[in-house]
Design a protein with these regions (language model features):
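Post-cleavage N-terminal segment of exported redox proteins
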Residues: 10-97, 149, 180-223, 261-326, ...
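Gly/Gly-Pro-rich "capping" loops immediately C-terminal to redox-active cysteine motifs
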Residues: 113, 117-151, 161, 167, ...
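Short sequence/structural segments immediately N-terminal
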Residues: 32-35, 40-42, 48, 63, ...
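Bacterial N-terminal signal peptides that target proteins for export
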Residues: 1-9
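Sequence/structural segment immediately N-terminal to covalent heme-attachment motifs in c-type
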Residues: 70-84, 92-119, 200-208, 215-247, ...
Length: 432
């Protein structure tokens, strides 16, 4: 019986990609009081209408759906990860393979093709985070095993990167029966690929977008150059940045960006450069530079460009920095949102890193994720800093975002930056 149990556990595991078990959540960290200085759409606020309807305030074009039922990265969100759940297939239910395939490709639900390759020219772009399921039916697994793996794979594979689709009510019981029916139709031989790029296991990674420091190629460079005028312009208090920082921005700010994020004793918290600008500029010049405002981001790029080529040298040894880094690491491995995902699921080598999530190639934290931020996003025609990128990640996870200048995001950014220590700053980047 023990051998049979081990075989069943192995069979259940074949649908997903796993990894080492993530560290347990650390106890709640005492975050200092902080009133967000971000623009309204970047504060992570929820509005409640007269009818009680909750609407999330986010950037233009982003969903306004409230994901308040699911836990977040907030340090005061003490909700535990939902417990693994046993799924019970509906008695006598017969699945519809055609409907199951439609669900497998449904972008509002998954799509499952974001991680798994299956046959069909309409499957584009497929991902490689999970195994190729093109011949899954040849494995002849029992329906109950497949159903449980779709309902909640954590019962047998705690470190899975696959969401608990049924337990989190993303797919209904009837829909999972249809998915099981579809998966059982997938048999070999697999027809030859007509396009090698359809298959994420043979697809070539993008070569990039050219010289990121060429102003004719990267609009973020032009915006940073324009920010020099703001540097010299007096604010409401009659002072400008240039009055205290002698020389050009390139001269005065050389080396500054190499030290951020850092613990700022005056404010009792970790601050990224954008966070510091939001308080320092107003305090000294009277000019507000709220987080995620164009002015804040552009000045940040200008200051970081002054340190291009210099190695990042953040504090990783002081007791305050070490504690903050540990909290950031805990956040990195914390599962959040409707899909119960962690940053680590996409950005560590034993999980999703260096693989395709749909058409997106997932970066590896070990290679460094921070030194090209802020970056020009060709898909958005905007300059994004690291915090907006973090907020954007929350939407597909089904989690409410925090304020862009929250201490939680700052300490997560600090942890990420430890992997870039010693590597040269190269800002602004270009990414899709």
């Amino acid at each position: 019986m023990r051998s049979l149990a081990r075989i069943c556990c192995l069979a259940l595991a074949i649908l997903v990609v796993g990894s080492a078990v993530a560290p347990r959540d650390a106890g709640p960290a005492a975050a200092p009081g902080w009133v967000s200085r971000a623009i309204p759409e970047a504060r992570g606020e929820i509005k409640v209408g007269p009818d009680g309807k909750r609407t999330a305030v986010r950037y233009k074009g982003w969903t306004t759906h409230d994901f308040g039922a699911f836990r977040t990265y907030a340090y005061d969100d003490a909700r535990p990860e939902p417990a693994p759940q046993l799924g019970t297939p509906p008695t006598g239910a017969v699945g519809d393979p055609k409907q199951g395939r439609a669900l497998f490709l449904d972008r509002q639900k998954g799509p499952c093709t974001g991680c798994h390759l299956v046959p069909g020219d309409d499957v584009w772009p497929a991902g490689s985070v999970g195994p190729d399921l093109s011949t899954f039916g040849d494995r002849r697994l029992p329906d109950a095993l497949i159903y449980q793996q779709l309902w909640d794979p954590r019962l047998t594979y705690p470190a899975t990167v696959m969401p608990p689709w049924g337990a989190q009510k993303i797919f209904t019981a009837a829909e999972i029966v249809d998915l099981v029916a579809y998966l059982k139709t997938l048999h070999g031989p697999v027809p030859p690929e007509r396009d090698a790029d359809r298959n994420p296991f043979t697809r070539q990674r993008s070569a990039g977008f050219g010289d990121n420091l060429d102003p004719t190629n990267n609009p973020a460079v032009v915006r940073a150059e324009d920010a020099a005028a703001l540097w010299k312009a007096p604010g409401p208090k009659g002072k400008s940045c240039a009055d205290c920082h002698a020389g050009t921005p390139q001269q005065a700010m050389r080396g500054v960006a190499t030290r951020y994020p850092r613990v700022v004793a005056e404010h009792g918290r970790v601050m990224g450069l954008e966070d510091f600008l939001s308080v320092h500029a107003e305090a000294t010049t009277g000019r507000a530079l709220p987080s995620e405002s164009d002015a804040n981001v552009d000045v940040t790029v200008m200051i970081k460009m002054a340190s291009n080529g210099l190695p990042l040298a953040i504090d990783t040894t002081s007791s305050a920095a070490r504690a903050a880094i540990e909290r950031g690491k805990t956040s990195f491995y914390r599962r959040v949102g409707e899909r119960n995902h962690a940053c680590a699921d996409c950005h560590t080598a034993d999980r999703g890193a260096n693989k395709f999530l749909g058409g997106r190639f997932l970066a590896n934290i070990a290679d460094g994720l921070t030194r090209h931020f802020p970056t020009w996003r060709t898909s958005q025609n905007e300059v994004w800093d690291m915090r907006k990128r973090m907020q954007w990640c929350m939407t597909p996870l089904g989690a409410n975002m925090l304020a862009a200048d929250s201490v939680e995001y700052a300490e997560l950014e600090l942890y990420l930056t430890t992997f870039d220590v010693g590597k040269p700053i190269n800002t602004p980047g270009i990414r899709h």
